[in-house]
């Protein structure tokens, strides 16, 4: 395909933009490099020797003995309606499936009501 004037102009403008931001980027990188040299890493990080770590009593061992409190309550869903006790549908069920299920449950309810009324 032939190159349009529009695409040529866009390419030209992208190049101008690239040059413009290259200057700003270079300045920013220079500033970051100068700040990195000024920063003294000795004040930021404190190293501990292996002996200090071994001699220090560990508090995490007492936490491991206690164990973790876990809530093991399972969500129970009714098979017919697929709702839990609160009337919510499962999290994995999308809205389209929820609407379909509601229609199905409504049909079951109307069939039950009709069946009860006909008894003589």
Swiss-Prot record:
Q: Name one GO molecular function term.
A: RNA binding
The record's region (Disordered) falls at 79-120
| Location within or outside the cell | Nucleus, Nucleolus
Its GO CC terms are: nucleolus; protein-DNA complex
List the PANTHER family hit by this protein, alphabetically. Answer: PROTEIN LLP HOMOLOG
List compositional bias (Basic residues) regions by residue number. Answer: 97-120
Q: Which Pfam families match?
A: LLPH
Q: Which InterPro entries match?
A: LLPH-like
The name this protein carries in UniProt is: Protein LLP
Q: Which family does it belong to?
A: Belongs to the learning-associated protein family.
A GO biological process of this protein is: dendrite extension
- What highest taxon heads this organism's lineage? Eukaryota
Record keywords: Activator, Nucleus, Transcription, Transcription regulation
So what does this one do?
A: Acts as a transcriptional activator of C/EBP. Required for long-term synaptic facilitation at the sensory motor synapse. May function in noxious stimulus-facilitated memory formation.
